[in-house]
Structure formats: C-alpha cells, structure tokens
Regions:
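Intrinsically disordered, low-complexity proline-rich regions
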Residues: 13-14, 20
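Bacterial N-terminal signal peptides
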Residues: 19-31
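Beta-propeller domains with acidic blade repeats across secreted/periplasmic ectodomains
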Residues: 36-313
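Hydrophobic residues within membrane-embedded alpha helices
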Residues: 7-8, 23, 214
C-alpha cells in the first residue's frame, strides 16, 4: 500500500491566507491541542508546532462530505452526494459514531452548499438553492427551490451559501452554474445589471429578492465573509493554459460590490484594466476547494480572522 503523502499548512508572509491541503474527502478536525482519541493523523501532515489533526468521522459516516456546516446547537451536518446527514456522537468523546438522514433529493454530487439559519435549512442541490423548514422541530418540510434554476453537482456549478451580517444570504455560483443575462436577478437595485461567469448573489431569506453583487470569476468553489462583511474566495485557474503566456494562476479574490474579476470564458482581461478587479494574491498552480474565515479562539492569535482554504490536489 503506498505511503500517505505529507500535507502542509502554510501562512503566506504577505497575507492572511492559509492552505490546508487535503488529498482525500475525509472529514478532519484541526485543533491546537493534543487529540483525546487515538486516531491521530498528525504524522501524515506538515503542521505548525503545537497543532494536531485527528479523524472526527470515517468516510462511511460522512458519505464523501461534499459540504459541511454546524447548526445552532453545534451539531455537524454533511452532504453525502444526494442527502443531508446529521452526524451523531453518542458517547460525547469528540468522535462521531452514527448519523441520521434529515433531507433528501439533493443529488447529484450534493449538496455542495449547506446552511442552517434558525428554523430553516438551505441546501445547494437538485435544480438550485433548496429551502427546508421545520429544522428546530425535527420535522423538515421541503418548501421548494428559491429563485430560478441553477446547474448543480458539477465542479463548476452552484457552490457555497452563507449568511451575511446584513441578514441576507450570499451565494457563490461557478462559471458552469447556468449564469446568463439577468436569469437570476430580480431587483433593479442589483449592483451588477447582468450576471456573468462565476458570480456572487445576494438573496433575501425567503428567496424573493435576488441581486448579483459581483461577477466575472473563473470558478471559486468557496466564499467567505470576514468580520467587516467583505467577501473573499480562492479562485481556480484554467488548467489548459498552463505554460502559455496568458495563463492566470489561482488567486485570492476580493469580491468588491459591483466589481468584475475579469474572466471571459477561456481567457481573462489584464488586471490593470480599469473595470477589472485585480487579485489580492496570486497562488500559482492549485485546485481550490472549500474555504472559511476562522472567527474563533482555539487556534493561536495569528490565525484568527484568516481565510482557511483547501487545495484538492
């Protein structure tokens, strides 16, 4: 059996972006103290001093983990390809040993976005952004799709959904999600009059109001909002262009309201164009995946308010 490659957690000296590279869709928990359980995976990773990593759930429990989130009670939800599972830790030892399926009909390869907000569960799957109600009571009811249809399940389709500080939903759509014209926009106040390529949408909780607040990305599977309400993502490159003069590396995007990231189908505008938002940081060859802002206190201070992202390679 081949040896497990070592992976790295690196802080770039010029930014607050860290890379947690994961070669398998295994659900892992990262902490700054020694794990209490024996399934210790620290030796398979290159980690900063004082960090340890252990397996919180096996692949059989997580079901592949296309996305994950915590609810208001700290319970972990994962997408297993077609459904939402809520993992169970029966003996409270920090290791999950069971699960229950709480929502279905979210395939293929989904849900790729999950959010619990009060009594509602939002999930990216099927034909777009789905709404379930009754989460607190344990009797979830599917209320249907919010807004117009999206493509889901593919690597370039509809991705992350998160709750904004302003009480709205924010949705990241990849360049293959079915973005065109004003297909999903309902409001005349939309900062971008037309959606184009990978776009970020601002959506009312009931799904009645849709705005495109930024556009023109390649395919960022992730979206994070910092404590100031600013949106960032780690965007993909075009692998066909590697070695060519116009190759654009993976990059950290700042989704400025009304801004355009400059990607056009199979090419990109130069970053010095007045109507193109330049990257915060170019990050070379990679395969961007999940990302989140770290807003807690368990990790050392220098990691707080940092954007943690996963490299699928």
């Amino acid at each position: 059996m081949p040896s497990t490659p070592r992976r790295r957690l690196i802080q770039h000296p010029a930014s607050s972006i860290q890379y947690l590279t994961l070669s398998l869709l295994t659900l892992l928990t990262l902490c700054a103290t020694s794990p209490a359980q024996p399934t210790n995976l620290t030796s398979a990773f290159d980690l900063p001093p004082g960090f340890h990593i252990y397996r919180a759930a096996t692949a059989e429990l997580s079901g592949g983990s296309y996305d994950l989130c915590f609810d208001g009670e700290g319970r972990l939800l994962v997408g297993d390809g077609t459904a939402v599972r809520r993992l169970i830790d029966r003996d409270n030892d920090g290791i999950y040993d069971g699960y229950e399926v709480i929502a279905t009909g979210l395939g293929p390869r989904g849900p790729q976005g999950l959010l619990v907000w009060g009594d509602r569960l939002y999930a990216v799957g099927g034909d777009g952004l789905q709404l379930f109600e009754g989460y607190r009571s344990g009797a979830l009811v599917h209320r249907g799709r919010l807004g117009a249809k999206f493509n889901t399940g593919g690597d370039h389709d509809l991705h992350t959904v998160l709750r904004g500080h302003d009480g709205y939903l924010y949705l990241m759509a990849g360049n293959g999600a079915g973005i065109e014209g004003r297909r999903h926009i309902t409001e005349a106040t939309s900062p971008c009059l037309f959606e184009r390529e990978a776009s970020v949408f601002r959506v009312s909780p009931d799904g009645q109001k849709w705005e495109c607040i930024a556009r023109g990305g390649r395919n960022p599977p992730n979206l994070g909002m910092n404590y100031l309400g600013e949106l960032f993502s780690w965007d993909s490159d075009m692998e066909w262009h590697v070695g060519l003069p116009w190759y654009r590396p993976t990059r950290l995007n700042h989704w400025v309201i009304g801004g355009d990231q400059g990607w056009h189908d199979v090419g990109a505008l130069p970053p010095y164009y007045l109507d193109t938002v330049p990257p915060v940081l170019e990050t070379g060859r990679a395969s961007p995946n999940w990302g989140v802002f770290y807003e807690h206190t368990q990790l050392p201070g220098k990691y707080r308010d940092a954007f943690l992202v996963c490299d699928y390679r």
